[in-house]
Curated annotation (Swiss-Prot):
Biological process according to GO: defense response to bacterium
Function: May be an antibacterial peptide.
Highest taxon of source: Eukaryota
Family, similarity comment: Belongs to the non-disulfide-bridged peptide (NDBP) superfamily. Short antimicrobial peptide (group 4) family.
Lineage: Eukaryota, Metazoa, Ecdysozoa, Arthropoda, Chelicerata
Tissues in which the protein is found: Expressed by the venom gland.
The protein's name in its UniProt record: Venom peptide 1
Modified residues (Phenylalanine amide): F11
GO cellular component, one term: extracellular region
Location of the protein in the cell: Secreted
UniProt keyword list: Amidation, Antibiotic, Antimicrobial, Secreted
């Protein structure tokens, strides 16, 4: 899933 920005977060993949 995409959260926040892209790789800006640990779960933003």
């Amino acid at each position: 899933k995409h959260f926040g920005k892209d790789s800006n977060f640990p779960f933003g993949t």
